[in-house]
Amino acid sequence: MKSLTLIPGQLSLSQLRDIYSHPVNITLDSGAFAAIDESVACVNAILAEGRTAYGINTGFGLLAQTRISTEDLENLQRSLVLSHAAGVGEPLDDDLARLIMVLKINSLSRGFSGIRLSVIQALIGLVNAGVTPWIPAKGSVGASGDLAPLAHMSLTLLGEGKARVRGGDWLPATEALRQVGLEPITLAAKEGLALLNGTQASTAFALRGLFEAEDLFASAVVCGALTTEAALGSRRPFDARIHEVRGQRGQIDAAALYRHLLTDDSAISQSHHNCSKVQDPYSLRCQPQVMGACLTQIRQAAEVLLAEANAVSDNPLVFAAENDVISGGNFHAEPVAMAADNIALAIAEIGSLSERRIALMMDSHMSQLPPFLVKNGGVNSGFMIAQVTAAALASENKALSHPHSVDSLPTSANQEDHVSMAPAAGRRLWAMAENTRGVLAVEWLAAAQGLDMREGLTTSPLLEEARHLLRERVPHYTQDRYFAPDIDNAIALLAARHLTRLLPAVLH
């Protein structure tokens, strides 16, 4: 298990990926304690002075004008968590739940939420003990924060709802806490709202999509380079001079990645160096331009999501230095929704371009390979239907890439009359990534088959490694066989990031 000393507001993308990918043991940096304590003191001072402050001694949403008596404040926070735990759908997996909890810890520890250190430490205790709250996937519109999923997360702290320990069976939360030696807690004024208000679920959903997009981008560059070799494509379109004069950073960097793979020691490239072909189709020739645009979208989304991962998205906010509590709208996840929409465009385009390269290899006039990449065509259908599968997946992503951030539906009796739909924007990225991974799997299989058919010729060392990785699991296609297991094997290799490792990281 990895250890992380959490300095509030300073998580990096690589740390966020690690938190999502592996169990983690968190220690909160002691430098955060003073600001946390000062924000609690500010809340207590407001109560002692008899002042009215939203979320501290009032109702919520349309009931914000209702003043709550001092003796009901603890019950108010408990009731808030219970009533807002109204999500539906399958529970989030351990990795996503852990990321949500760490994002919430990071935000609360900034010291603007009026929540006690002991409550934050209780949430850290869940993470360190491997306790996963039952968090249904659906039920948030991304404003006022991710109320339902964060309420389900918070139930476990109270000993309510369901949870599991290190991937075990779902249990009553009290039993899960007992197994790891933890006790339920009681919330004080403001603390229930601090736990529930925020964009942590939306941000975690989109971050998962971002990590998927980064991996898909790298895998697609490798697959595209393999196809370029298999189809006897030209290296000239990757010349750095072309991309420097345009000045698009994503395109420049993408072209460099292709050059990293398409090195001069390729016998295939040398075999057609002086051929008469003037131009390649766009799906080969314009890879740096299209993939560079995708890289730019991914990077811009990463910048937004990194800021949000380190943000304070609670409401109201406690500014202890000024003894002030201000009700605002940092819970509105519009930046996350728009970032997720941009990631969706990139994932869709990565798959769309890959599908076109697959189609190119099926066409013997374009690729100079046997039709559908198989000998004795007619008796054998080869990759014919595998390309159809890729087309189906790429087409489905076109519909899924419709922007969610332009959608809104009023809630809470029109008090919350514009919402972001960020959770849905992030959640659909997972299905899109699965589709694009399927397309890339077919391309990898097809490109390896095409390279095999360039008998006696090898490609560059890195691309030979990519071919070898596949051939360890999937043999050369000599005649028709049950095809689905081959695609599944390629998908598994892609999901394990085997091709991603052939390139440097593109986000950090």
From Swiss-Prot:
Residue numbers carrying 2,3-didehydroalanine (Ser): S144
Q: List the disulfide bonds.
A: none
Q: One GO CC annotation, please? A: cytoplasm
EC main group: lyase
Q: In which pathway does it act?
A: Amino-acid degradation; L-histidine degradation into L-glutamate; N-formimidoyl-L-glutamate from L-histidine: step 1/3
Q: Which domain of life is it from?
A: Bacteria
Recorded catalytic reaction(s): these are:
L-histidine = trans-urocanate + NH4(+)
Where is this protein localized, as stated in its record? Cytoplasm
**What is the recorded post-translational modification?**
Contains an active site 4-methylidene-imidazol-5-one (MIO), which is formed autocatalytically by cyclization and dehydration of residues Ala-Ser-Gly.
GO terms (BP aspect):
L-histidine catabolic process to glutamate and formamide; L-histidine catabolic process to glutamate and formate
Q: Name one GO molecular function term.
A: histidine ammonia-lyase activity
- For this chain, the site of the 5-imidazolinone (Ala-Gly) cross-link is A143-G145
Q: Which InterPro entries match?
A: Aromatic_Lyase, Fumarase/histidase_N, HutH, L-Aspartase-like, Phe/His_NH3-lyase_AS
EC assignment: 4.3.1.3
| CDD domains documented for this protein | PAL-HAL
Q: Which UniProt keywords apply?
A: Cytoplasm, Histidine metabolism, Lyase
State the family named in the UniProt similarity comment for this chain.
Answer: Belongs to the PAL/histidase family.
The name under which this protein is listed is Histidine ammonia-lyase
Give the organism, scientific name: Klebsiella pneumoniae subsp. pneumoniae (strain ATCC 700721 / MGH 78578)
Q: What is the lineage of its organism?
A: Bacteria, Pseudomonadati, Pseudomonadota, Gammaproteobacteria, Enterobacterales
